[in-house]
UniProtKB/Swiss-Prot annotation:
Catalyzes the first step in the D-alanylation of lipoteichoic acid (LTA), the activation of D-alanine and its transfer onto the D-alanyl carrier protein (Dcp) DltC. In an ATP-dependent two-step reaction, forms a high energy D-alanyl-AMP intermediate, followed by transfer of the D-alanyl residue as a thiol ester to the phosphopantheinyl prosthetic group of the Dcp. D-alanylation of LTA plays an important role in modulating the properties of the cell wall in Gram-positive bacteria, influencing the net charge of the cell wall. The gene is dltA. Pathway: Cell wall biogenesis; lipoteichoic acid biosynthesis. One of its GO terms (biological process) is lipoteichoic acid biosynthetic process. Belongs to the ATP-dependent AMP-binding enzyme family. DltA subfamily. Gene3D superfamilies: 3.30.300.30, N-terminal domain of ligase-like. ATP binds at T144, S145, N284, T285, Y286, G287, P288, T289, D365, K473. The keyword Nucleotide-binding applies. It is found in: Cytoplasm. NCBIfam families: AA-adenyl-dom, D-ala-DACP-lig, PRK04813.1. InterPro entries: AA_adenyl_dom (IPR010071), AMP-bd_C (IPR025110), AMP-bd_C_sf (IPR045851), AMP-dep_synth/lig_dom (IPR000873), ANL_N_sf (IPR042099), DltA (IPR010072), DltA-like (IPR044507). Its EC number is 6.2.1.54. Keywords: ATP-binding, Cytoplasm, Ligase, Nucleotide-binding. This is D-alanine--D-alanyl carrier protein ligase.
């Protein structure tokens, strides 16, 4: 098991001028990344609480992450797209001493020191720092959706991250340094799939910002100017990019590796991609945030595409085993499993335990094993994935119920081809709805201050009451049937 910081540092010493990370016109070389992160680590060395790293796709967010690893305190990434109320929830849960803010907006939290890019650049701290991160230390905490209305902080230990990065590098069939594309914001653990395999193999990390997410033409300009080799994204992002007619092997021959995670990869998407890139290495992977990004993988070939629809997610990676309960729930066992949720013993005890000295996580996903391959069949609870983002419907409902216009509510996912395409909020209003559009606007306006955009229902339907089951519980299935009737 080779230390991540040592690998990055060794490459930086032999290739100091190679670009480590790039976003538009901003870039940092390996020398700059290691120097600036060491300067930050000196500022953090007496800090025993995680470093909040705040911003959006700034190369200096990598400085924050690497610096926090060197200092041994670990980091918590927060993207600027996260609503302020949710940011405050996370900060209150983490209780950090220091926030590294790479954005132009001050967070202004009393009793918390706020470092900026300028403060690191102006620092005269030494540019060398021996990493203090231990294998069993928490390297990062990523917050996911929580059913109580509060996000849950998933804690990943350093050894788990190292194993994951090594596994990802082993899947790469190219030799030498590569240009990697990262689509996911750093507060989404899919970004980990690009960051550390890229940097530990001497590659350049190219960051896709939120403007490109909905505008493939902007991404097209990026591909024209940068010979991307390895692509990491959700399947949904690839589906959108396939609308570009020139996304093919003849137009962009450098693209030779594709890694997908975060949601189910549709068969049609994989087939369309392989039709355009018949020589590429394409991996379909699966894993929850609680098990260090991905725990299974399969290389998709024309033979696999021909044999399976839906597609398998492959076999488990080293030091990780999978099994299912009698109810069909997938359980993950091994080194990849998280240490649990930050300061949330009740939630941790509900889904994590130990067996034979190894950590176990109950995923809530339905799965079967067939022909030696694992297949994911959806959720066993009310947690869903929309555009690659995992969320709990109960969290959205909790926030909806805070509205003065909402007496009761159920959020219903709308499916197409076994994939969630948007959400509908079934609402029992506190008063008669006289203007549908105005009521919808007011509720959405309230939600925007408390939830990310992707968690806000596309539309609302108004109901006099919500149906109950025979034992007095809310009948979600009936609500969904009523909406779709």
């Amino acid at each position: 098991m080779t230390d991540i910081i040592n690998l990055i540092n060794d490459f930086g010493q032999s290739n100091p001028e190679r670009v480590a990370v790039r976003h538009k016109d901003e870039e940092l070389t390996y020398q700059q990344l290691m120097d600036e992160s060491s300067k930050l680590a000196h500022l953090l060395q007496d800090n025993h609480k995680p470093l909040i790293v705040y911003g959006h796709m700034s190369p200096y967010m990598l400085v924050g992450m690497i610096g926090a690893i060197k200092a041994g305190c670990g980091y918590v990434p927060i993207d600027t797209s996260v609503p302020s109320e949710r940011v405050n929830m996370i900060i209150n849960k983490v209780q950090p001493d220091i926030i590294f803010n790479t954005s132009d907006t001050q967070l202004n939290h009393s009793n918390i020191q706020e470092l900026t890019i300028q403060s690191i650049q102006d620092s005269d701290n030494p540019t060398l720092f021996d990493s203090q991160m231990g294998l069993t230390d928490v390297v990062y905490t990523i917050f996911t959706s929580g059913s109580t209305g509060e996000p849950k902080g998933v804690q990943i230990e350093y050894a788990s991250l190292i194993e994951f990065a090594e596994w990802m590098v082993s899947l790469n069939e190219s030799e030498g340094s590569q240009e990697w594309l990262n689509q996911a914001p750093f507060s989404f653990d899919l970004s980990v799939m690009a960051i550390y395999p890229c940097l530990t193999s001497g590659g350049t990390l190219n960051l896709v910002d939120k403007e490109m997410i909905n505008k493939p033409k902007l991404l097209n300009e990026m591909l024209v100017n940068t010979p991307i080799n390895a692509w990491v994204s959700t399947p949904s992002f690839m589906e959108m990019c396939l609308l570009l007619p020139n996304l093919n092997e003849s137009s962009y021959p450098s693209l030779n590796h594709f890694f997908f995670c975060g949601e189910i990869l549709p068969h049609r998407t994989a087939k369309a991609l392989l039709d355009r890139y018949p020589s590429a290495v394409v991996y379909n992977t699966y894993g929850p945030t609680e098990a260090t990004v991905a725990v299974t993988g399969i290389k998709l070939t024309p033979e696999v595409i021909e044999a399976y629809n839906p597609l398998p997610v492959g076999v488990s990676r080293p030091n990780t085993s999978l099994f299912t309960t009698d109810e069909g729930e997938l359980v993950i066992k091994g080194n990849s499993v998280s240490l649990g949720y930050l300061d949330n013993k009740e939630k941790t005890d509900a889904v994590f335990n130990f067996e034979d000295g190894l950590r176990i996580y109950h995923t809530g996903d339905k799965a079967i094993e067939k022909d030696g391959q694992w297949f994911i069949q959806g959720r066993i609870d009310f947690q869903i994935k929309l555009n690659g983002y995992r969320m709990e419907l109960e969290e959205i409902e909790t926030q909806l119920r805070q509205s003065e216009f909402v007496r009761e509510t159920v959020v219903v996912p709308v499916y197409k081809n076994n994939k969630v395409i948007h959400l509908i909020g079934a609402v029992v209003p506190t008063e008669e709805v006289r203007d549908d559009l105005e009521m919808t606007r007011q509720i959405k306006s309230e939600l925007k201050s408390r939830l990310p955009e992707y968690m806000i229902p596309r539309k609302f339907v108004w109901m006099k009451q919500l149906p109950l089951t025979s034992n007095g519980k809310l009948d979600r299935k009936q609500v969904a049937e009523d909406i779709n009737a």
